[in-house]
Every structure is written in C-alpha cells, then in structure tokens.
Amino acid sequence: MIKYGIIGAGWRSEFYLRIAALLPSEFSVSGIYIRNSEKQKKFANKYNVKICSSLEELLKTDFDFVVSCVNKDNILEMIKTLAAKDIPVLTETPVTDGTLTGRVQVAEQFHFMPRNLAYKKIIESGILGEVHSVRLSCCHDYHAASLIRFFLDTGFEKPEIISISLTDPVTRYNSRTGYLKSPAVIPAEEKIKVFKFKDKTAVYDFSFEQYFSDIRSSQMTIRGTNGEIVNNTCSYLKDGVPQRFEICRNTYGSEESLDGMCLFNITGGNVLYTNPFPYSRLSDEELAIATCLLKMKEYLDTGKEFYSVKDACFDCHLFKI
C-alpha cells in the first residue's frame, strides 16, 4: 500500500484522488490540504478523504510522501518548504529551478503513457536501427521536450532550436469541464519547434486544442536507419525485405466482454506494454500518473530517480519556461 498526502485542490489533484478511489488496495490518500472553504466542501462531498485546512495538519497524517499539486507560481516555494522539513515530495510540473534540494521527484507522466512505453520497447528492440528523428504532436512544451529526450536518448545535450508560431482556426467544442453549449471557431495558437542535436533531430508541432478535441488528433513519427513508426504502424526491413505490423490496444469491456472497461496490453508482433493495474478503470493518463506514484515509492526505497529536478529544469529550459 502506497500512502500519500495531497496539497492543492486544482484539476490535477483530482487525478490522484481518482487513482486511490479506483485502486484502494494499491493506494491511499492520507489527506488533502485545501485552503479554500468552498473547495473543502466540494471535495468532502465528492471524495472519501480527510480534508486538512493547514499544511501542518496534513503533515501529521500517515503518508510515504506528499504530492504537490499547487499552481505553477507556487511550485518552487512549496518544494522548498517541504524539503526544509525533510518531507519527500512528488511535485507536479513545471519545475524550473535545477538547484532545488531534498527528496524530490517530478511527476512527468508522459514517459509512462502506455503507447509511449510501447514505442520505447520497439526502439529498444533494435528493429528500427539507429533512431535519429522524432516528429511529435501530442503534448505541450516541457512534456514534449521530455519525450524527445526519452525517444532519442540525447541526455542533457543542448540542441539548436528554431521556433515559429502559427494561428490554427479551429472549432472549440470541448474543454476540461465537458462539451460546450455553444461551440465556436477560435484562433488557436500552433507552436512549431525544430530541435537540431549533433546527429539527431526532432520536430514539435502542437496546439492546446489537441488535449480536448477529436478534430485535432495526436501524431507521432519515430524514424531510424532501418525503419519507422508512424502513429500505430511500424515499418522496418528484415533481411532486406520490408515488414510491417500494427500497434494494437487490447481492451476489456467491449462488446460481449464482461471483464470491465480497461486496457489490458498493447501488442505488435510481441507484447509491448502490459497494464500494471489489470482490470482497473483508469485512463492512459491515470495509468501514467499511477506509475509515477509507484516510481516515487521505489525512489524512496532505493534512491533510483525516474525524473529528477535536473531533468525537469532542463526540459523547461528547452522551451524557455
């Protein structure tokens, strides 16, 4: 059982509450620190969780570590406050100060998204040859930077960066709070960046509308000397002959399946990803965050980092955040 306290009552904090509610044998929330009285009432009614009106009250609860979900303007100060008390912290992004000390890891979840782990498994198999190029349109700013480094294995190499910004007129019909009553065309900003490393390249192309829109889909291309992945199709050469397979999500709960709605695994010739929480009704985002929680406990037990303050700061620097 992994026990954690939560600081903050924003949109991100609810992911950690849902994970504990859906996986009660794996995770437990010791309490959540909320300053706003209206939000205290809302969360008390919505979740079976202890509401703490002060940080001191939260820190008296029984936890392995604290998850900080404060707004980005207060992230660094909260980390410093908890580090001074020797409290281990899993903090939400972004983290822009690489000099922070203490037992801190950053919840960069995109490394642990099922499809991205499947891509990484294909890369590590060697069938693509030497991977040298990534083109991604799936997440914003520092998250994209972390994925670029994850797939290209460029470490802390500083690339040359070319940036442009375009306007992408698109109908906004959905948001964090659900479908809009009056969809309307908006001038969405589309950011494009080209990263030129010593012998590798990456192209970033993203609009925030993609997170909540089915008319602006995610795209991924990973290229190597012997093959490529384009979204869910992998093409490569074997003994000089072109081969191809589809990357397939295998789920429960569709049609006549009575096992409940969930992702079981991802396959493509071989098993590329297996859900560590089988039969759990978690979205891919929630699976990735739950994996961060597992990694945080492993970090505390072994000292093995999974996404450090240094990593987070470097990725923010690539987008000048």
Q: What are these model-derived regions, one by one?
A:
Residues 130-217, 221:
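Rossmann-like dinucleotide-binding domain that binds NAD(P)(H)
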Residues 44-46, 57, 65-70, 271-321:
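C-terminal helix-rich "cap/oligomerization" subdomain common to oxidoreductases
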Residues 63-113, 126:
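Beta-strand-loop-alpha-helix segment that lines the small-molecule cofactor/substrate pocket
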Residues 50-61:
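Short acidic low-complexity segments
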